[in-house]
Amino acid sequence: MSGTNENLILKYGEPGSIYPRNFTQSAAVGFYRSWKPILIQEGYYDFLLGFESYLEFQKKLSVLAEEPVGVSLALSCMVEVNVAGGILSHATRIQREEQSENLNPNAVGVLDSLWQAFRAGGSTKIFAVGVSEPGWETKLRKLSSTVKDEKLSGTKSFITNGAEADIIFWVIKSEEKNPVYLVRRYQNQTNPNLNSDASDISNQMIEESFHTDFTPLVTHLKLTLCEYPISPEDLVLENYGKLGMELRLKELLSLVSLLIGKIKKVSLENKLVNDEREKLKLWRDNFLGNCQGNPDADFLLSGFPFPTEDLLLALCKHWNLDSPKDLKSMDPDYQLFVWEDQFTQMLIQKKKRKLS
């Protein structure tokens, strides 16, 4: 477990390169994958492993985001920890309870092996999560991915870290539930479920990797599966359901931490920005200081909407911009902090109803 919050980009980076120092660049090794062993070494997954608080993880993200390359790296890390790690933690908790009740020593075997991706000494593995689909309108009931006769078909339109992932946690629709299945990408490893014929594999998995203009080093994936073979052991969680709100709120809170880190250099030039940054930092530290263990949806919703507006307005004033939407003209990464997606707006309305 790491006890320091030294900036990893400055400590391990190579000037002029997005990769760690002494890293042999290879087209087969992506940006996040090249850094993950260092992130493990420096304790960035310690929260998942139960070694530190969620606040300590957030502080690490802020320090990492102080460097331009670090914003992309912090985003990749926080998505894997919050979303893939959140699913894995929830599934492990449920299956350990079942193991205790049923006295079944094999209940958590598959999940235990997945945890090696966050521990030192193992091979580098990356997990991503597929939820968003074309036309789903952020509503789980509108997902069209299904499993029939142990074959999964569907399209996920925006899988963050997907182009580097070894395994994708795929959320589907099944009656009134949203099970999560493991999908192993054949580019990165042998998948025993897949037909060995290359033409069949290419028909079962159709991929399109892409980047966005913000955090451009983060890879995203659109993936279509057509009768992809699924075994019962690939079911990692019986119902994603309400967990989705917790994971999205964690993502948004982590974006608060990225914002705190990203604008540090600007805060050294502008007193108003510095004052608002310190206020936001103090709010985060006090809010999460009250959290013991994993912050669940109810706890996170109690602090939502997270108070980033004053800091964003201070940045606008610093650059003489009309609104936070214009911050992207200074740096595309600022799009991360203007939350207009349907799901976040739904959360805002949910909080308003709770207060009324």
Task: Describe the predicted segments one by one.
Residues 312-333:
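A glycine-biased, small/acidic residue-tolerant capping/turn segment at secondary-structure junctions
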Residues 58-62, 85, 89, 257-268, ...:
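Predominant activation on well-ordered alpha-helical scaffold segments within soluble catalytic domains
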Residues 194-196, 206-289:
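Glycine-rich beta->alpha junctions and the first turn(s) of the following alpha-helix
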Residues 121, 138-139, 160-163, 174-175, ...:
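Solvent-exposed alpha-helices and their adjacent loops that cap or buttress functional pockets
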Residues 125, 141-143, 164-166, 177, ...:
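A generic structural signal for well-ordered coil/turn residues at beta-strand boundaries
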Residues 155-204:
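A short core secondary-structure module
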Residues 20-164, 193-195, 344:
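Glycine-rich flavin
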